[in-house]
Regions:
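N-proximal low-complexity "stem/linker" segments adjacent to membrane-targeting elements
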Residues: 2-5, 9, 14-21, 29-37, ...
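Short, flexible, basic/aromatic active-site loop/helix in glycosyltransferases
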Residues: 242-271
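Conserved donor NDP-sugar-binding/catalytic core segment of glycosyltransferases
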Residues: 204-247
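Acidic donor-binding segment of Leloir-type glycosyltransferases
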Residues: 130-170
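Non-catalytic, C-terminal membrane-associated alpha-helical segments of glycosyltransferases
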Residues: 346, 363-440
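Acidic donor-binding loop at a coil-to-helix junction in glycosyltransferase catalytic cores
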Residues: 274-277, 298-310
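Short aromatic/hydrophobic "clamp" motif used to bind/position activated sugar donors
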Residues: 192
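Glycine-rich, basic loop-to-helix element that forms the pyrophosphate-binding segment
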Residues: 154, 171-187
Length: 440
C-alpha cells in the first residue's frame, strides 16, 4: 500500500542570538504564508547568518519558537568542517566576511552586474526583480535577458515597471547559456552574478556573494545557498527531501593547486560546487574560460549542464571557487509531478552533456576526465539508485526525521537522461552551427 502524499510544510526563518542562545525572531520566509501547526522547515540563523536547517513538528498550543529553538541548538552543536574543501576554507577565510552580517566592515564588494535570463514568466520575474532592487550592495546593475520571447510581456514589464533601474536585453536564440553569454556581453560589472527568475534574493545575497572577490584576486567563482521558498506540494517536498539545491552551511574553497584528497573525481563533480540560480564569476575569469558553452542549458537539446560546465572551465583555467551559505536565495520549486519528472531527466542529461562539452572544448582535460569517468558514472548511477531504494533518512535537505522515498521511476529517468546527454549536446552543437550558417 502506497504512503499518503506529504502534507504542506511551513517554511520559516529562526534567528538565534548564538549557537546556544535565545530566539531573536521567528518569521515566515519572504512572501510566504504564516506558520501553522504541523510540520515546519526552518532556516536557522545565528545573529543573522545562515547556519543550519531543521525540520520539526509544532502541535496546536505549542510555542513554535521554543520547539524550533531546541531543535536548532541541537543541530548547531553537531556542525563543523568535515571535508577537505571545508577545511581549506576554514584555514583560508575571507577576512571579515566570515563574521556575522552586522559586524562586517572594510571589504567593499566590486561593481557587480546581476544577469537574470527569463522566458515568458513576467509575474515570477517581477517578484525576483523586486528582491534584487532592495539589495544592500551599493554598486550594482541588473540586466534582464529576454530569451527567445514569443510575446512582449517581459519587455513591457521591464520598461514600464522598472524603467532605467533594470536593463533589458533581447536574445532570440533559445538556450540558457546563450542568454547568459548575451547578458555577460552587455554587462559592465567587474563581477557577473547570475540568478533565476523563480527566486527571491535575501537582502544581503549580493554583498555576501561578491565580497570574497575583493579579498582574493585568484578567485574566479563564488556560489551560494539555495533554499525552498515553499514546500506546499508533494513534488516540492520530494525534491527538497532529497537534497534540493542546497550545498550545506560550511564555507568551502576549491583550489586547483590544492585538489581535495577526499574528492578523487575533482574537478568533474561540478554538482557539488553550486547551482546556476546562485553563482557569480569574476568577469575576466569567465572570459578567459571561454564563457558558457552555448550548446548547453535549458532551452537546448542538451537540457542542462551550463552552470556545471562553467564551474569546471573556470577551475581548469586556474581560478579558485568558493561556496558561502551567507549568499542566500529562496527558490520556488516547480509544483507538479510532471515538472519533477522533467527535472530528473534534465539533471541526468545535463550531467553528461557538460562532461561531453568539457571534452570537446577543453581536450587537454581528456586524460584526467577519462581516468575519472568510469568511477564518476558509477558514482552517479549508484547515487540515483540509492535514492530510489533508501527506505528511511532525514528530510528535507537531510535535516529532518521523516522520509518520502525517491521513486525508482525518477531514478530511471535520471539514468536515461545520462545516456541521452552526449546525444543532446551533439544535437545542440549541430543546431548552433546550422543557425550560424544561416546567418541567425
Amino acid at each position: 500500500m502506497s504512503s499518503p502524499p506529504p502534507r504542506p510544510i511551513s517554511v520559516v526563518e529562526l534567528d538565534l542570538a548564538g549557537p546556544d542562545g535565545p530566539v531573536l525572531s521567528l518569521r515566515p520566509v519572504p512572501g510566504g504564508p504564516a506558520l501553522r501547526a504541523g510540520a515546519v522547515y526552518a532556516l536557522v540563523r545565528v545573529e543573522g547568518r545562515p547556519a543550519a536547517t531543521v525540520l520539526g513538528t509544532v502541535a496546536d498550543g505549542e510555542d513554535p519558537a521554543e520547539v524550533l529553538g531546541a531543535l536548532a541548538r541541537a543541530q548547531l552543536a553537531e556542525t563543523g568542517p568535515r571535508t577537505d574543501a571545508e577545511r581549506l576554507a576554514a584555514v583560508r577565510p575571507i577576512g571579515r566576511t566570515d563574521l556575522p552580517a552586522r559586524a562586517r566592515e572594510g571589504l567593499t564588494p566590486p561593481r557587480t552586474s546581476v544577469v537574470v535570463a527569463t522566458r515568458e514568466r513576467p509575474e515570477q520575474l517581477a517578484r525576483a526583480l523586486d528582491s534584487l532592487l532592495v539589495q544592500d550592495h551599493s554598486d550594482v546593475e541588473i540586466v534582464v535577458v529576454d530569451n527567445a520571447p514569443r510575446t512582449t510581456d517581459t519587455h513591457d514589464l521591464v520598461t514600464r515597471k522598472y524603467g532605467d533601474r533594470v536593463r533589458y536585453v533581447r536574445e532570440d536564440t533559445p538556450g540558457l547559456a546563450v542568454a547568459h553569454n548575451a547578458g555577460a556581453a552587455a554587462a559592465e560589472g567587474e563581477v557577473l552574478a547570475f540568478t533565476d527568475d523563480d527566486v527571491i534574493a535575501d537582502p544581503h545575497w549580493l554583498t555576501a556573494l561578491t565580497q570574497p572577490f575583493a579579498a582574493d584576486p585568484g578567485l574566479g567563482c563564488v556560489t551560494g545557498l539555495i533554499l525552498p521558498a515553499r514546500l506546499a506540494t508533494p513534488a516540492q517536498i520530494l525534491l527538497e527531501s532529497h537534497g534540493g539545491f542546497a550545498k550545506g552551511f560550511e564555507p568551502r574553497l576549491y583550489d586547483p593547486a590544492e585538489p581535495p584528497a577526499d574528492e578523487p573525481l575533482f574537478p568533474f563533480t561540478a554538482g557539488s560546487f553550486g547551482s546556476g540560480a546562485n553563482m557569480a564569476f569574476r568577469a575576466a575569469a569567465l572570459r578567459q574560460a571561454g564563457g558558457f558553452d552555448p550548446a548547453t542549458g535549458t532551452g537546448t537539446a542538451a537540457r542542462g549542464g551550463d552552470d556545471l560546465y562553467a564551474f569546471v572551465a573556470v577551475l581548469s583555467a586556474g581560478f579558485r571557487l568558493r561556496y558561502t551559505a551567507e549568499a542566500l536565495v529562496w527558490h520556488h520549486h516547480r509544483d507538479t509531478w510532471q515538472d519533477l519528472r522533467n527535472q530528473a531527466y534534465g539533471y541526468g542529461a545535463g550531467l553528461t552533456a557538460y562532461l561531453t562539452a568539457t571534452l570537446v572544448r577543453h581536450p587537454r582535460l581528456l586524460p584526467a576526465l577519462l581516468t575519472r569517468l568510469p568511477r564518476g558514472l558509477a558514482h552517479a548511477r549508484a547515487m540515483t539508485a540509492r535514492r530510489g531504494e533508501t527506505p528511511e533518512g532525514g528530510v528535507p535537505g537531510e535535516h529532518g526525521t521523516h522520509h518520502h522515498p525517491w521513486p525508482r521511476s525518477l531514478s530511471r529517468l535520471e539514468r536515461r537522461g545520462m545516456l541521452y546527454g552526449p546525444i543532446g549536446y551533439a544535437k545542440a552543437r549541430a543546431q548552433a552551427a546550422q543557425r550560424k550558417g544561416a546567418g541567425r
